[in-house]
């Protein structure tokens, strides 16, 4: 009788040795092709392209063996003849390195530091010697359990609760940290949960049972004030709830925890404890305001994200404070840069109330040097020398505004995150990090060849700031799994910081671990007062239709729109983004220009860049020049419309719906997109959406069901997919409705601001609690980070030239 038996998992080296002996000639043929490319780096798609060029018979032999598996998992190949080194990623977050001598067919397995040293020879011609600074954060987390399953990535708080609840509640003695936390928890000197009448865990359980018994005798709606004095006498303060029913639920949750600890119950209980009253959100760069700024340099989705986030957060904070029976007024402050030269915006105003809120404001603090306040806009790539002084100034302003410390500091993007790290360190406050986009992923090979890009982008400074912030923070929220750990075939933004090198500066052998429980996926949504389905006719903003008609179809060409649409009966494919290389708007225009069938089926409308004024952004200037060239090369006038960036979000919402009325589609063609807010906006309006497979949109959209994935590196295939869709719709119009409805359903399930704000506040409570009762504040690594900041980051920041006024 056959029996199942466990077999040893062979190492990468063993598997390769077996394949080498079986398929020596085929492997030699492929590696010789790769070596023949000469000194340099081949990305995953280039390695696969070389593989596809070898004879089919050889290809088939390799496909089924261990070498085929290695090849499919290879993210990059380093060629330094006669050696070829491979960075192999069998699954997200797991890396192995090897190199092969093509002439001798000798295989060596490398450690990360050895691989990086080999890679550095591309730049230096020889290694930097034995005394290069190597950064390794792994020892600081070695004693702390970490998940190993892919499904745990981005679910850090669940893992943390499972591990620490078992540890914390295993006997009476271990309950003292919880008791201390509940006794010390206060706001503005007022104790919120327990007073000093409760001295030990036994007394706590006794009091909770006594309170439970009493609450069972009063009507559920009885206000807390009716029994406040009675509860205070036995040791309970007023943070348990606003009425008898709510207080009873909270008490029973804690009793359940003390009886039989459970991670879900723990999270629910901690989510009820009122911990967050003052929130500070940092976003220094760009033009941060509520009107007339979208489309300005460095000003796009991040501004929209934060404003929507703040409205949702304030609502949830008010709701929770009320439910817990407290009369505390929350505050949310968005900290950004004050721009004296505000260029027709409110960016020169110190304090500005956030529309649609009661207690949230934008607080602007200027950049300052020893010569005074910096007046002009500065690119996000050049802010580094100002941020340390800026942090001190922000701390001073916060003390004035809040009359105390915030409960949560949220950083946004690289500059906001390093300021958040410095502030959280100074004030001892829980820190949350939101990257939005890590530039190292957006600019391939920007680490190894950083010196070539340094004058323009100062990536050495930015990557150092990113590494510092992601290791300093208490928790990181991302919009998608891909942002953390990519997909089967692509590397995640954070994952790309696992091991990398900046030759001549430092070598990162362990920068971040994507399995770290600090990672949590919390996806945002679109503002549903602005973005709603085109079929909701009673809500449609018809007052904008004349203006939108002018934008899309006017025969006039001016600074706001050029080129005309001659056939108004055709559906419109539409895109809206900043005009930069990564957003790849000119790429979409080129795909369209080259595909005669697509041009026959649909018109193309692009909202990008601002032709009404001269851009200060070098990338935008280059992309504008390219756009004019494409219009001329492909004779696009008549089928194409280029509209300057549109600042009015409310009208933009109706613009999406008007495009949907034409039975068109939204296309997001970015080379890489961290999340894809415009994708969510378009889908929320019911517009079928085609979006990049690189980054967040790959998770937002279920391919072929709620939209379509496109590969920006294969524009011809993307254009063919659009042709296929519109030809199908021509034959069967219900196909358009089917994709539209599935997109709407997908948004309702996962991408709303209400879900987001509930999750963010719960995470803050959980991580704040664990910091108090455990060693989760990572003191050892923070001392290491202080040294890294002082000895590396500060010098790099000082090397960035100050702006010329």
Curated annotation (Swiss-Prot):
Residues 275-752 are annotated as: GT-B glycosyltransferase. It comes from the Eukaryota. Its EC number is 2.4.1.13. Transmembrane segments: none annotated. One of its GO terms (molecular function) is sucrose synthase activity. It is an enzyme of class 2 (transferase). It catalyses: an NDP-alpha-D-glucose + D-fructose = a ribonucleoside 5'-diphosphate + sucrose + H(+). Pfam families: Glycos_transf_1, GT-B_Sucrose_synth, SUS_EPBD, SUS_N. One of its GO terms (biological process) is sucrose metabolic process. Keywords: Glycosyltransferase, Transferase. SUPFAM superfamilies: UDP-Glycosyltransferase/glycogen phosphorylase (SSF53756). Coiled coil: none annotated. InterPro entries: Glyco_trans_1, Sucrose_synth_GT-B1, Sucrose_synthase_pln/cyn, SUS_EPBD, SUS_N. PANTHER family: PTHR45839, SUCROSE SYNTHASE (PTHR45839:SF31). NCBIfam families: sucr_synth. Sucrose-cleaving enzyme that provides UDP-glucose and fructose for various metabolic pathways. Belongs to the glycosyltransferase 1 family. Plant sucrose synthase subfamily. This is Sucrose synthase. It comes from Vigna radiata var. radiata (Mung bean).
């Amino acid at each position: 009788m056959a029996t199942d038996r466990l077999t040893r998992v062979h190492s990468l080296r063993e598997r390769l040795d077996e394949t080498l002996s079986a398929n020596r000639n085929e492997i030699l043929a492929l590696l010789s092709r790769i070596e023949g490319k000469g000194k340099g780096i081949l990305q995953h798609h280039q390695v696969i392209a070389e593989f596809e060029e070898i004879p089919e018979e050889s290809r088939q032999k390799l496909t089924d063996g261990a070498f085929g598996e290695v090849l499919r998992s290879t993210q990059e190949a380093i060629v330094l003849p006669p050696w070829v080194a491979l960075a192999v990623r069998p699954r997200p977050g797991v890396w192995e390195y090897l190199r092969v001598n093509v002439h001798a067919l000798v295989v060596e397995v490398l450690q990360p530091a050895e691989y990086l040293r080999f890679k550095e020879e591309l730049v230096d011609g020889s290694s930097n010697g034995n005394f290069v600074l190597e950064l390794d954060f792994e020892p600081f987390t070695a004693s702390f359990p970490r998940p190993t399953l892919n499904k745990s990535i981005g679910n850090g708080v669940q893992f943390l609760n499972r591990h620490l609840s078992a540890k914390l509640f295993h006997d009476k003695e271990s309950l003292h940290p919880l008791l201390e936390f509940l006794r010390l928890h206060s706001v503005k000197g007022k104790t919120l949960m327990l007073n000093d009448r409760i001295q030990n865990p036994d007394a706590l359980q006794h009091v909770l049972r006594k309170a439970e018994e009493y609450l069972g005798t009063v009507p559920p709606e009885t206000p807390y004030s009716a029994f406040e004095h009675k509860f205070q006498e036995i040791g309970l303060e007023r943070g348990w709830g606003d009425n008898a029913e709510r207080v009873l639920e909270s008490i029973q949750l804690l009793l359940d925890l003390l009886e039989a600890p459970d991670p879900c119950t723990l999270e629910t209980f901690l989510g009820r404890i009122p911990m967050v009253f003052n929130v500070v959100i940092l976003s220094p760069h760009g033009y941060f305001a509520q009107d007339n700024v979208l489309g300005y340099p460095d000003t796009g989705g991040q501004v929209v994200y934060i404003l929507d986030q703040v409205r949702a957060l304030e609502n949830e904070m008010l709701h929770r404070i009320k439910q817990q029976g407290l009369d505390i007024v929350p505050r949310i402050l968005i900290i950004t840069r004050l721009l004296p030269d505000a260029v027709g915006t409110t960016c020169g105003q110190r304090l500005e109330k956030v529309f649609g809120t009661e207690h949230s404001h934008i607080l602007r603090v200027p950049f300052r040097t020893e010569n005074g306040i910096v007046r002009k806009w500065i690119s996000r790539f050049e802010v580094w020398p100002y941020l340390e002084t800026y942090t001190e100034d922000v701390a001073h302003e916060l003390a004035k505004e809040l009359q105390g410390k915030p409960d949560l500091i949220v950083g946004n993007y690289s500059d906001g995150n390093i300021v958040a790290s410095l502030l959280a360190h100074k004030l001892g406050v829980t820190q949350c990090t939101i990257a939005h986009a890590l530039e190292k992923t957006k600019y391939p090979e920007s680490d190894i060849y950083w010196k070539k890009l340094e004058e323009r982008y100062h990536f050495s400074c930015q990557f150092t700031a990113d590494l510092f912030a992601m290791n300093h923070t208490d928790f990181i929220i991302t919009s998608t799994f891909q942002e953390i750990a990519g997909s089967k075939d692509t590397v995640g933004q954070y994952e790309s910081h696992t091991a990398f090198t900046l030759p001549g500066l430092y070598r990162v052998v362990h920068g971040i671990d994507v399995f770290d429980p600090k990672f949590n996926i919390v996806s945002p949504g679109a503002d549903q007062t602005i973005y709603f389905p085109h079929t909701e006719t009673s809500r449609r903003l018809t007052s904008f239709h004349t203006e939108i008609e002018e934008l899309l179809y006017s025969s006039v060409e001016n600074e706001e729109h050029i080129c005309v649409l001659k056939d108004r009966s055709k559906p419109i494919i539409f895109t809206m983004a900043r005009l930069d290389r990564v957003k790849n708007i000119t790429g979409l225009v080129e795909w369209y220009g080259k595909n005669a069938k697509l041009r026959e089926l649909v018109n193309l409308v692009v909202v990008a860049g601002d032709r009404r004024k001269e851009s200060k952004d070098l990338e935008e200037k280059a992309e504008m020049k390219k756009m004019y060239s494409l219009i001329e090369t492909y004779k696009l006038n008549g089928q194409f419309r280029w509209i300057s960036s549109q600042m009015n979000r409310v009208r933009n919402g109706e613009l999406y719906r008007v495009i949907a009325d034409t039975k068109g589609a939204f296309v997001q063609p970015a080379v890489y997109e961290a999340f894809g807010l415009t994708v969510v906006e378009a889908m929320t309006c019911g517009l079928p959406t085609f979006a990049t497979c690189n980054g967040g949109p790959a998770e937002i959209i279920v391919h072929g069901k709620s939209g379509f994935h496109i590969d920006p590196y294969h524009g011809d295939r993307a254009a063919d997919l659009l042709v296929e869709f519109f030809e199908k719709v021509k034959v069967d119009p219900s196909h358009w409705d089917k994709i539209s409805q599935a997109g709407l359903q997908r948004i309702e399930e996962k991408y709303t601001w209400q879900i987001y704000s509930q999750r963010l506040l719960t995470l803050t409570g959980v991580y704040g609690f664990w910091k108090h009762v455990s060693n989760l504040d990572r003191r050892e690594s923070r001392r290491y980070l202080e040294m890294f900041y002082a000895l590396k980051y500060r010098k790099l920041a000082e090397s960035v030239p100050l702006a010329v006024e």
